[in-house]
Amino acid sequence: MQQVYVYDAVRTPFAKLGGGLAKVRPDDLAANVIQAMVERYPNLDQSKIDEVVFGNANGAGEENRNVARMASLLAGLPTSVPGLTVNRLCASSLDAAIHASYSIGSGDNNLVLTGGTESMSRAPYVVPKPERAYPAGSSQMVSTTLGWRLINPKMPEEWTVSLGEATEQLVDKYQVSRERQDEYAVLSHQRAHAAWEAGHFDNLVVPVGDAKRDETIRPESTVETLSNLRTVFRKENGTVTAGNASPMNDGAAAVLLGSEQASQTLGADPLVRIASRGVAANEPQYFGEAPVPAANLALERAGITWDQVGAIELNEAFAAQVLVNLDSWGIELNDERVNAWGGAIALGHPLGASGSRVLGTLARRLKAENRRWGVAALCVGVGQGVAMVVENEDATE
């Protein structure tokens, strides 16, 4: 197997539900980041891009089933460049990078443009077809924005609870306090705001129309203000609120992967090397636990320990999930290695794009902070976790 590298990363701003990107189709969001990426390499023969692999969690509407191919064509790439869409819900675009890394590692491909896209604002309603023609009754219309839809009745009820209720069950299991959740959420907003002010996103985020900045960062948040918010999923003894959970968003992100030889194709040096990957699963209702075994597996495969990791990008679906993960790894809530530029609670979580956002940010952070080892990890609805370990080979730490 040959080595695989991350060469570059871009993303759109992440807009709030019904916000600045609500009128932009998900295939156009993806086309925007594809165009932005290839424009950085004006001398690149675009036919040398072996494949476009994108993640998407919905796929029920304007994604038109295979959004990677649609976006590739919309972006003006040669028709000879294939497109593949993968779906592992929230980790879809990290899985896109994993798929691409295997194809490059095997020698089948040299340069693959990966990414993810999601428009939660434009997710359609679906109506199941009747079992017989001309029914007299009514059909149920189901939103595809988030969570379960058209559940198979053979599924055990405890597996099919909402993501929020599942998180409350995680809180019960691990006794995560509301105060700790709110404290972590405030930290996410503060770090995201500071990262924007410091210019960390200047070379990472590309505008789409009038949308130029992430829309859900609230640096004025405090533990006191968050403590006044109502719980969403349990009226009594609940802890999960709109303040300590990720919002619903629209956005897209892209990560360019290649072999060592791709450096000559691009005329650029890589950011980081992909060292290992890990995927794990557990009981569906405890989806928030799954990044723990996934990341542990990736670390084992890379031959390193948590003490050697200098940067961690852990997707913040819920503050409670983050705290359960960090506690399991023996990492403090305010550890500077974790989501130093903010996380999904502040930046946003456009499902299929978040894996690329996490990986791209991790690669940039390792370079900016002169750290060698980094871990990217995401939880996935229905009890899965995905992780990747990368190495900044130029680090002097």
State the predicted function of each range.
Residues 1-24, 146, 224-289, 293, ...:
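Condensing-enzyme catalytic core mediating Claisen C-C bond formation in acyl metabolism
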Residues 11-12, 23-32, 43, 180-265, ...:
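N-terminal extracellular/periplasmic Venus flytrap/periplasmic-binding protein-like
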Residues 165-168, 201-204, 211, 275-346:
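Active-site pocket-lining segment
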Residues 27-41, 67-71, 96, 163-170, ...:
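Short, well-ordered amphipathic alpha-helical segments that serve as non-catalytic structural scaffolds
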Residues 22-112, 117-135, 205-214, 285, ...:
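Conserved beta-ketoacyl condensing-enzyme motif
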